[in-house]
């Protein structure tokens, strides 16, 4: 058969192929920022990049040592990980989050983003189902719905949702991008709503140890969910707290029935955290000192950038937790992005996180002390 026959359908994955998955998805947001990044890189003193919240400080030595000590692991690791890892996760949840949970109800994941993106599909959601997430939100919540053919629904209040159609409800506290923290009363209301409608509630808590003017609470805390985790999952990451974005070290915890279902699915898909990273994760979660040290770094950078931005004319809203300042000049976000790029400063436009953010920018304080100091100088009028 001639391979040049124009009557043949395109190969799967080629342009024009039926059901090409990427056609469902929006343009990858960071690609739109590239022209502004090039402008900022042209500054004589170089780029001050506050756009992506990626760690820049060293991986703590004890974590590096744990990783190195487990590099001679030629065999396949397990999806669930060793009991020591799951006990470390459960111990951290109890010690730091006040959650009573056993090792049978936790599951390591290959970073938190892959879980967010693939969770709806792994739980069998599809056409006719709704995945709900906050109006200002991490874009991957929407992507996760689109990947499995479900309908993404952005909400401002739970009363806007049709509980008969929503199958998965995302919470995010502290919020990316706004840094807003949901109080225990708000979390309880969400849990009650989800349970009343038999909706799985998944709380993205990746910034929970980074509260500044507020003390974030986990959805798994007894004051929020009572004595049961039924219908609840919490997602946690070591990327920010331990500078492990390069390790892809995260986990999900909560309803043991749902965790077991995810385990069975992920075993078939081979979604496995490498054994050295599993060992490093267990050590990282058992140590609080390196987290306190990193918090001090972020607190200094946050204070310096906040003061400089406010002096420049920005208003900061929320931002009581997480690694971001949610800033506005009360004008379109891309105008602000362009203005700051001329100063060699790159920030994320607020509309990356939904139309409600179109007059804000997100400023990540994850750059080095030297780059933060450089930006502070450039913002002086």
Question: Which sequence ranges carry the predicted segments?
Answer:
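A short acidic, glycine-rich active-site loop
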Residues: 73-76
């Amino acid at each position: 058969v001639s391979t040049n026959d124009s009557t043949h359908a395109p190969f799967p994955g080629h342009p024009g192929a039926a059901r090409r998955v990427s056609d469902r998805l929006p343009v990858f947001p960071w690609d739109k920022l590239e022209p502004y990044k090039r402008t900022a890189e042209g500054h004589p003193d170089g780029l001050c990049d506050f756009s992506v919240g990626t760690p820049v400080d060293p991986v703590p030595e004890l974590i590096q040592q744990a990783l190195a000590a487990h590099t001679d692991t030629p065999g396949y690791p397990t999806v669930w990980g060793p009991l020591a890892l799951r006990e470390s996760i459960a111990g951290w949840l109890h010690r730091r989050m006040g959650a009573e949970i056993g090792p049978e109800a936790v599951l390591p994941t290959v970073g938190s983003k892959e879980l967010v993106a693939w969770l709806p599909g792994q739980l069998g959601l599809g056409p006719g189902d709704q995945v709900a997430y906050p109006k200002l939100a991490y874009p991957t919540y929407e992507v996760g719905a689109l990947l499995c053919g479900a309908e993404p629904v952005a909400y401002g209040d739970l009363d806007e949702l049709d509980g008969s159609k929503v199958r998965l409800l995302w919470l995010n506290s502290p919020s990316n991008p706004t840094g807003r923290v949901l109080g225990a009363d708000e979390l309880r209301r969400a849990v009650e709503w989800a349970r009343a409608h038999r909706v799985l509630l998944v709380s993205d808590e990746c910034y929970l140890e980074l509260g500044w003017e507020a003390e974030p609470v986990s959805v798994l805390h007894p004051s929020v969910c009572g004595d049961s985790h039924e219908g609840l999952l919490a997602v946690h990451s070591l990327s920010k707290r331990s500078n492990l974005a390069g390790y892809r070290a995260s986990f999900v915890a909560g309803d043991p029935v749902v965790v077991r279902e995810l385990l069975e699915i992920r075993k078939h898909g081979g979604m496995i955290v490498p054994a050295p990273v599993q060992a490093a994760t267990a050590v990282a979660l058992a140590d609080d000192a390196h987290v306190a040290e990193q918090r001090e770094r972020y607190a200094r950078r946050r204070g310096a950038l906040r003061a400089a931005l406010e002096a420049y004319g920005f208003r900061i809203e929320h931002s009581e937790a997480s690694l971001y300042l949610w800033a506005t000049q009360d004008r379109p976000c891309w105008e602000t992005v362009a203005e700051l790029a001329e100063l060699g400063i790159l920030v994320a436009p607020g509309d990356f996180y939904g139309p409600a953010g179109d007059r804000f920018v997100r400023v990540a304080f994850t750059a080095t002390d030297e780059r933060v100091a450089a930006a502070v100088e450039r913002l002086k009028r």
